[in-house]
């Protein structure tokens, strides 16, 4: 059975009005987030913004940061740095796995050579 778009956190399903109502924010605030490239939802064929659940969660985070007094440019930079940090953590995990394989290969070859 195939999954439905509603099951996909990245499916762009919600309009600006729906998201504004869900989060108790103004539609203009959501448009400003897009204009400042903080949260840029996909567009429908008619050009309307459509938000995924993942983007709605991100907007909630942005609302919290703005409530704490952060500017949109500061928030955009925070989001960029968090993305870079996640990528660095993934790369570290890859390198640690590679190091583990290399150590295992080295130990196996030492065992073979001592026989």
Placement of each model-derived feature along the sequence:
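Arg/Lys-rich, alpha-helical DNA-contact motif
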Residues: 2-12, 35, 40, 53-115
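Short alpha-helical "recognition helix" segments of helix-turn-helix
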Residues: 19-20, 75
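Append "Primarily bacterial transcriptional regulators
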Residues: 20, 33, 51
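Short coil turns linking two alpha-helices in DNA-binding domains
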Residues: 26-29
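Beta-hairpin "wing" of winged helix-turn-helix
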Residues: 40-46
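Minor-groove-contacting beta-hairpin "wing" of winged helix-turn-helix DNA-binding domains
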Residues: 47-53
């Amino acid at each position: 059975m195939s999954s439905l778009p509603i099951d996909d956190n990245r499916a762009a399903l919600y309009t600006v009005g729906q998201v504004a109502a869900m989060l108790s924010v103004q539609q203009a605030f959501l448009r400003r987030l897009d204009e400042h490239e903080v949260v840029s939802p996909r567009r429908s064929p008619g050009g309307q913004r459509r938000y995924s659940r993942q983007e709605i969660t991100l907007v909630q985070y942005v609302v919290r940061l703005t409530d704490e007094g952060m500017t949109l440019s500061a928030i955009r930079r925070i989001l960029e740095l968090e993305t870079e940090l996640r990528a660095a953590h993934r790369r570290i995990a890859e390198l640690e796995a590679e190091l583990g394989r290399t150590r295992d290969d080295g130990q196996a070859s030492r065992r073979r050579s001592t026989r």
